[in-house]
Amino acid sequence: MEVDAPGVDGRDGLRERRGFSEGGRQNFDVRPQSGANGLPKHSYWLDLWLFILFDVVVFLFVYFLP
């Protein structure tokens, strides 16, 4: 039997081809996480400003408690 020949029932060649196509297809399915306008979906600056605003509101609420 030759080194490059498929197995007895021919499944080795199919398995190799299927594995190769699945591996190649995985690269095409990866898409960048972005919104409709091209900006990133998750804005860390927005999170920062919301966190600061929340802290200020909580501080003022606790400070002015009777």
From Swiss-Prot:
Subcellular location: Endoplasmic reticulum membrane
Transmembrane segments: 45-65
Region annotated Disordered, chain positions: 1-37
Pfam families hit by this protein: ALN
Basic and acidic residues biased stretches: 9-20
Highest taxon, organism lineage: Eukaryota
Principal location listed in the UniProt entry: endoplasmic reticulum
One Gene Ontology CC term in the entry: endoplasmic reticulum membrane
Modification sites for N-acetylmethionine: 1
Membrane topology: Single-pass membrane protein
Assembly: Homooligomer. Can also form heterooligomers with other sarcoplasmic/endoplasmic reticulum calcium ATPase (SERCA) regulators ERLN, PLN, SLN and STRIT1/DWORF. Monomer. Interacts as a monomer with ATP2A2/SERCA2; the interaction results in inhibition of ATP2A2 Ca(2+) affinity.
General function of this protein: Inhibits the activity of the calcium ATPases ATP2A2/SERCA2 and ATP2A3/SERCA3 by decreasing their apparent affinity for Ca(2+).
PANTHER family the UniProt entry points to: CHROMOSOME 4 OPEN READING FRAME 3
Name of this chain's protein: Sarcoplasmic/endoplasmic reticulum calcium ATPase regulator ARLN
Gene it is expressed from: ARLN
